[in-house]
Amino acid sequence: SSDLVYVFSYTITVTNTGEVPAQLIARHWIITNELGHVEEVKGLGVVGRQPLLQPGESFEYSSGCQLRTPTGTMRGSYLCVNHEGETFECEIPLFVLQMNESGDPMPMPEKRVLH
């Protein structure tokens, strides 16, 4: 087996599109490489933060992951809590981790709105 590791970075903007303040408490990622190997990652917050977002406010962060294949996918969810202490999940739609032919990361061409 190869010891080669592919390192991907991604930038995510989380926007509160609701009408009340909400805080991002935890994350849950499902990372799948092109061979079908699945890794789940769970933890509190994102990049060491648990941002509190007022309606219309955004929080942007960058992070990364490693795969043993040159392509893969990520999807998951954020656990959030509103101003009344009620928790809710925000689904993160699947996105592709991929190298282009020159070996550089592929740009993310689209923005996704999470409700």
Language-model regions, residue ranges each:
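Asparagine-centered strand-capping/turn motif at beta-strand->loop junctions
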Residues: 13-19
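Short acidic, flexible loop segments centered on an aromatic residue
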Residues: 20-39, 80
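Intrinsically disordered, low-complexity Pro/Gly/Ser/Thr-rich segments with frequent PxxP/GP/PP motifs
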Residues: 39-71
